[in-house]
Amino acid sequence: MKEIELYRLSTDEKIVHVPETRSIVVRFNAPKKVLSTSLLNGGYREDIKGFFNYTCCGPGSCMSLEKYEEHLGKCAAVMGLDPARSTGIGTAARMENAAIVEETYEELKVAACVTAGVEGNAGCAGDPAGYYGAGARPEMYKPGTINILLFINADMPPGILTRALVTCTEGKTAALRELMVGSRYSENPATGTGTDSTVIICDPKSPLYFRSAGKHNKLGELIGKTVKEAVKKALGNQNHLYPSTQHSVTERLRRYGVTEEVLYSYFREYKKDGIEEEWRHLWRKIDRDSEMVFISSFLAELLDEYRWGLAGNEEACRMAKKLLQMTAEAYGMRSVPMEIKSAEDIKDAFCRLAVQAAVKKNGI
């Protein structure tokens, strides 16, 4: 099978893309310490000989979780790896969209290879779950997975390799925060997806030996930087998710239910014969306006603080009304006539005001 070299590690192992099997494969040329979240030979291991990440399906469900572990073993064999001595993870993301980032400090090198998609499955830790999991084996969820392969050219004890996983996860969450990705299951900012996987590999023969992988240590810094940057690049490649595309009212407030479809229902109240295509045309002329985008960001933050108990209902409603008044003035409208007494009132008032602003800006 044809292999395309994507990257050569400092230990001379290659990260290769195998188009025929829709996979990224790494074969180790020396013993490694491996920490894997995979169902296939997961946990801490010192006998793993290779790794793969592969595109397991297209849009929609893949297979039952009950069959997934067995399936991973079969995939390993197809890729020329020993199923008993390899670990692998799957995703709906395309391997062509993988991002690789390396950071160095003196002799230390940390490289992250990431595939990522969040459009259908972004979630926040603590969101309502879809199943219990102790006995039931449901179908796999919507496409949307962040898979991270992290290489460290240093040695460390197993506990610190586990600590590196914590830092790696924080780096992933920082990337989602900087892109303002919201949960698809709640009103919370996303911290990951429901199916994320991580594999961390370090070199037991390296003269570099670390007893810390937290944020105060240079190793922790490099882990955070590589993972954060690689996750952001992979999301751009897979979902066309960039800072520029997130400069949008509906992206900032999507997790609070403010979408083009919802705003269209408000538009129909304003113009009963309005058609959806007309509304989309009107809205897209205002969705990225600086005033509207930043007001929506402030409102999202205000609603977050209210939900988290950092702001009381009365002060949240009072400040929301001031923000909405600023919006009205920015678009040449007189005032916000609604009485605002709750978070639902805040969202309702914003939707009505946003529709009026779009209509006014387009001269209707």
Q: What are the residue ranges of the model-derived segments?
A:
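Alpha/propeptide regions of enzymes that mature by internal proteolysis
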Residues: 1-364
